[in-house]
């Protein structure tokens, strides 16, 4: 089995050149699968939906440690550029720089004789986590003792991540000619009133995870400016610091009979392993980890800042990519050698 010294900058840029907005991960998945196969890994491409495939690669038949992250990005595609210090463009920190760092770390471990390793790269993390949900049923998951999931954490160890609750709020009215608004009922005016109360709501929080926060991400409604709007809809994204039950109950109390709330998707907050010697923090975002319950004990670590992800100026520092490789190798060795004790 060939072992390579991976140039993490070059690999990051090669991955970024391949557009992979959620729903279109086919080409980047094929590239990664072929690349890992050329290194001698046993590669499986797991069909998820519409030709979109997870990539699973193992260095032996006893993969106790997996590195994992996602291949999809948010829109729009932004081609890569670089200077001496940074790599810019879509996926630089979320999460193609992480893919490159994890592959480079796996190769360093193999070069040192460690073969109890695997790699899992999923589709659809930025949407509904269809990839991780499908991966959770793979038989190889039973062999995994530890999974290091990669997201931009500033190379700090994430010891907790908030949950994610997506909801749809709908209001109904009665259409009428806009010259006679008293003959109708405006669903948009009703929506504005309800959202004002929802945005100002005091939602249940948690001492460990912090506050539960709410974002109104989308609003739509109405037919034309000369028609009293009969319907309106808003998309809510709540970052959960608690179980979803108390939050949904509180929101239903606020909305009352003025509208309808529907849960679109939900993943709960997760506490993860604490490891001595690493900078540690709780992150506000969610990951694939809640869907990968069969993949051993989860850890969260990756280069780049979540504040730069999903932006027009997305970038990752080259020094952070190099540091991430070293951190992944160090953490992987300690986990495989039994040098990490569970704190939570």
Language-model features: locations:
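Acidic/histidine-rich catalytic neighborhood of metal-dependent amide-processing enzymes
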Residues: 100-166, 206-207
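Structural motif corresponding to alpha-helix initiation and N-cap regions
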Residues: 51-52, 129, 285-286
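Acidic-glycine-rich active-site phosphate/pyrophosphate-binding loop
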Residues: 71-83, 143-144, 159-170
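Residue-level marker for buried hydrophobic side chains located in beta-strands
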Residues: 65-67, 148, 174
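Metal-dependent amide/peptide-bond hydrolase catalytic core
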Residues: 3, 20, 27, 152, ...
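Acidic/His- and Gly-rich active-site-bordering loop/insert found
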Residues: 1-91, 114, 300
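Alpha-helical metal-binding/catalytic segments enriched in His/Glu/Asp
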Residues: 67, 84-129, 167-171, 181-201, ...
């Amino acid at each position: 089995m060939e072992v390579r010294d991976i140039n993490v900058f070059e690999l990051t840029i090669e991955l970024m050149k391949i557009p992979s907005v959620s729903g279109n991960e086919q080409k980047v998945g094929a590239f990664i699968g072929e690349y890992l196969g050329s290194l001698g890994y046993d590669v499986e491409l797991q069909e998820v939906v519409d030709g979109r495939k997870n990539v699973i690669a193992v260095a032996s038949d006893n993969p106790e440690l997996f590195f994992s992250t996602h291949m999809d990005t948010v829109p729009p595609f932004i081609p890569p550029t670089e200077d001496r210090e940074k790599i810019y463009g879509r996926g630089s920190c979320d999460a193609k720089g992480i893919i490159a760092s994890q592959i480079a770390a796996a190769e360093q471990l193999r070069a040192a004789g460690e073969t109890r390793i695997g790699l899992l790269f999923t589709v659809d993390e930025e949407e509904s986590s269809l990839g991780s949900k499908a991966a959770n049923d793979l038989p190889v998951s039973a062999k995994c003792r530890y999974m290091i999931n990669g997201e931009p954490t500033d190379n700090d160890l994430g010891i907790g991540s908030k949950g994610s609750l997506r909801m749809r709020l709908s209001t109904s009215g009665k259409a009428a000619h806009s010259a006679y608004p008293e003959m109708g009922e405006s669903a948009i005016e009703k929506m504005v009133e309800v959202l004002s109360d929802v945005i100002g709501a005091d939602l249940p929080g948690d001492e460990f995870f912090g506050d539960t926060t709410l974002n109104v991400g989308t609003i739509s409604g109405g037919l034309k400016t000369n028609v009293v709007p009969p319907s309106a809809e808003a998309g809510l994204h709540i970052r959960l610091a608690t179980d979803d039950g108390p939050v949904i109950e509180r929101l239903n109390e606020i909305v009352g009979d003025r509208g309808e709330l529907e849960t679109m998707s939900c993943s709960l907050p997760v506490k993860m392993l604490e490891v001595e010697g690493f900078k540690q923090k709780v992150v506000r975002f969610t990951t694939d980890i809640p869907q990968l319950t069969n993949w051993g004990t989860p850890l969260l670590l990756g280069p780049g800042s979540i504040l730069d992800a999903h932006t027009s100026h997305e970038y990752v520092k080259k020094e952070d990519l190099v540091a991430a490789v070293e951190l992944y190798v160090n953490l992987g060795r300690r986990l495989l050698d039994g040098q990490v004790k569970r704190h939570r």
